[in-house]
């Protein structure tokens, strides 16, 4: 299976939106997605890559470079990773993780964090298989 990984482009927004809504149960619309990506596309801290199969977007990974006291080079926070359901278990998620890890290494970043839903046990197993440890809790409060 020939998968191409590249940075997101404007014509990918609708596909990424669809994959995100399906994977995470969101109900975002194209206007929301366009506003978001237009806001962050020229900001070095944000990076989104898409996976293409036969020129179709079948997955994506988004991250933000954050800083914290005591973490001089900061860390990369994966804020979204999803692959179309029928394309899962074909190595696409692995290629996306490898791409974001290579990007982090190029920037001198030595730590990547991510959050995943408690119910997403398949995702938990995937991240553990890639060397990620689950040694913290994430709390969320919506206003």
Language-model features and meaning:
Residues 2-16:
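A short beta-loop-alpha structural element at the N-terminal edge
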Residues 17-31, 69:
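Helix-loop element at the rim of GNAT/NAT acetyltransferase active sites that forms part
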Residues 28-48:
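Active-site rim helix/loop that mediates acceptor-substrate recognition in acyltransferases
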Residues 50, 56-65, 82:
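Conserved beta-strand in the GNAT
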Residues 81-88:
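A short, internal acetyl-CoA/4′-phosphopantetheine-binding micro-motif in the GNAT/acyltransferase core
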Residues 89-102, 129:
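Conserved acetyl-CoA-binding loop-helix of GNAT-fold acetyltransferases
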Residues 94, 118-136:
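Conserved active-site alpha-helix within GNAT-family acetyltransferase domains
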Residues 97, 104-115:
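Conserved GNAT acetyl-CoA-binding A-motif
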């Amino acid at each position: 299976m020939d998968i191409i990984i590249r940075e997101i482009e404007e014509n990918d927004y609708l596909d990424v939106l669809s994959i995100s809504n399906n994977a995470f149960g969101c109900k975002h619309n194209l206007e929301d997605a366009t506003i978001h990506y237009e806001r962050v596309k020229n900001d070095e801290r944000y990076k989104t890559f898409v996976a293409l199969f036969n020129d179709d977007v079948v997955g994506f990974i988004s991250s933000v470079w954050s800083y914290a006291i005591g973490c001089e080079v900061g860390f990369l926070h994966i804020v979204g990773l999803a692959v179309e359901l029928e394309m899962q278990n074909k190595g696409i998620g692995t290629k996306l993780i490898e791409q974001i890890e290579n990007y982090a290494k190029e920037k001198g970043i030595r730590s990547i964090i991510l959050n995943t839903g408690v119910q997403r046990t398949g995702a938990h197993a995937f991240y553990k298989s890639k060397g990620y440890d689950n040694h913290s809790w994430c709390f969320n409060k919506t206003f």
